[in-house]
């Protein structure tokens, strides 16, 4: 029986550690370490340097996942990139990651399908389920799934924005979902959504400045 399992994992966070105290001393936010820690459990987050894109973070995580799985980029059959902070409105980060992995270079070129999944916090789970389905169906042997965000450039790093600015940072994680004939791997996946509450937390495109 054809099964799917996670053959490799990788993660990456930028080197700039921003502590709760840094939010006050570096950015002038009226807050404190104790206030944030008590309400969120967060002690620190990472911020990317200027010019570092979400696909750059995804690349580092992807390289580590490939190494962990003992695979090369050319072994991949599909790239899935989950993010709500892409490099551009379009195209998606997946095609940028494909190029950065060297899959568009000369004799090593392998133009595998690459697509983004934009489903907010659940995007990585939906991507993992999609990878699972591709592998189980026989359409792919190795699928790269990346979840990455670069939220720091969009944060209101002021006292006015502290309700959100204290929560988010930048980073990436990646897994390789691979085929196996052994009786092991990812079990049954069950996804669901409830559109009745879609407007409870939303941002309309035309509201984005």
Predicted regions and their residues:
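Condensing-enzyme catalytic core mediating Claisen C-C bond formation in acyl metabolism
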Residues: 1-50, 159-209
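Short beta-strand segments
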Residues: 7, 82, 118, 143-149, ...
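Short, active-site-adjacent cap segments at secondary-structure transitions
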Residues: 13, 86-88, 151-153
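Short acidic, glycine/serine/threonine-rich loops at helix termini
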Residues: 17-18, 90-92, 154-159
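Conserved catalytic cysteine-centered active-site region
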Residues: 30-56, 84-142, 148
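Phosphate/pyrophosphate-binding loops at sites that engage ATP/ADP/AMP, CoA/4′-phosphopantetheine
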Residues: 61-77
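Short glycine-rich or small-residue beta-strand-to-loop segments that form or flank ligand, phosphate
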Residues: 77-84
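Flexible, glycine-rich active-site loops centered on histidine and acidic residues
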Residues: 136-171
């Amino acid at each position: 029986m054809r099964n799917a399992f996670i053959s490799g994992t990788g993660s990456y966070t930028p080197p700039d550690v921003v502590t709760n105290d840094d939010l006050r001393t570096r950015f002038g936010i009226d807050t404190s370490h104790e206030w944030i820690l008590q309400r969120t459990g967060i002690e620190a987050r990472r911020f990317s340097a200027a010019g570092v894109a979400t696909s750059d973070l995804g690349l580092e995580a992807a390289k580590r996942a490939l190494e962990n799985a003992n695979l090369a980029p050319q072994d991949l059959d599909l790239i899935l990139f989950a993010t709500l902070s892409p490099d551009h409105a379009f195209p998606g980060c997946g095609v940028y990651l494909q190029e950065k992995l060297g899959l568009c270079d000369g004799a090593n070129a392998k133009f595998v399908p690459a697509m983004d999944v934009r489903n907010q916090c659940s995007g990585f789970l939906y991507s993992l389920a999609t990878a699972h389905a591709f592998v189980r169906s026989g359409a792919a042997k190795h699928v790269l799934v990346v979840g990455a965000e670069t939220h720091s450039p969009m944060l209101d790093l002021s006292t006015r924005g502290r309700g959100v600015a204290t929560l988010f940072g930048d980073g990436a994680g990646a897994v390789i979902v691979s085929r196996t004939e052994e009786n092991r791997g990812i079990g049954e996946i069950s996804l669901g959504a409830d559109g009745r509450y879609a407007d409870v937390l939303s941002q309309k495109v035309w509201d984005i400045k």
